[in-house]
């Protein structure tokens, strides 16, 4: 699969699939060890991961985000951690949803103030309303995860759908959580436009 590398910053990088869902995956690097988050495999991905350091593990933040997590973990010779709890390496995990149909944790890297969300927050066009830089998942806009995530103060936010927010992430984060409900009409319109744009002419 063709992917485009993105979200380059001093603690890692990402890669994104050019499609309606804008699936985005990430590699986080700490002390020469590389943790891979919700990966979709693609051209050059394994090589880029190995070039960044020694593979340490593959982390799946959402129960239905199987993607290529298991296959890539096997290729890299590391463990596949599915919706982990507590802590792992330098990361802590925050429960976002825990229902029969939706089990999701967010990855919080306190030492670097990096937040990674699988589905709860995103930047893909069908997530956003108007000029939003970051948005709550369409199905969570009525009850956004303020209680779960609101105390965090991220400097970088990486998403499972869409490119990350690498500048002034805190402002985008607070706005997304506080305005999600009133921006529902705009989000619906944006999602329709995004869907139409991907349809063959």
Task: Name each model-derived stretch.
Residues 6-7, 28, 85-89, 107:
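Short acidic-hydrophobic surface loop/beta-edge motif
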Residues 21-24, 43-48, 67-69, 101-104, ...:
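A generic local structural motif
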Residues 2-13, 17-20, 34-36, 98-201:
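Metallo-beta-lactamase
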Residues 42-87:
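Active-site metal-binding motif and surrounding structural segment of the metallo-beta-lactamase
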């Amino acid at each position: 699969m063709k992917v485009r590398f993105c979200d380059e910053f001093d603690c890692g990088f990402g890669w994104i699939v050019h499609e309606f869902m804008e699936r985005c995956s990430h590699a986080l690097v700490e002390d020469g060890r590389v943790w891979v988050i919700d990966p979709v495999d693609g051209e050059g991905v394994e090589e880029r991961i190995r070039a960044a350091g020694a593979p340490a593990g593959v982390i799946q933040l959402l129960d239905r985000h199987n993607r290529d997590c298991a296959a890539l973990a096997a290729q890299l010779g590391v463990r596949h951690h599915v919706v982990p709890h507590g802590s792992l390496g330098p990361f802590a995990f925050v429960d976002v949803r825990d229902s029969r149909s939706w089990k999701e944790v967010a990855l919080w890297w306190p030492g670097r103030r990096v937040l990674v969300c699988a589905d709860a927050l995103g930047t893909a066009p069908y997530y956003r309303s108007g000029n939003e830089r970051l948005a709550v998942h369409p199905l969570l806009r009525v009850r956004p995860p303020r209680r779960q995530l609101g105390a965090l103060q991220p400097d970088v936010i990486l998403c499972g759908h869409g490119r990350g927010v690498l500048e002034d992430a805190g402002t985008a984060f607070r706005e997304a959580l506080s305005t999600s409900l009133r921006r529902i009409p705009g989000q619906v319109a944006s999602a329709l436009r995004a869907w139409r744009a991907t349809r063959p002419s």
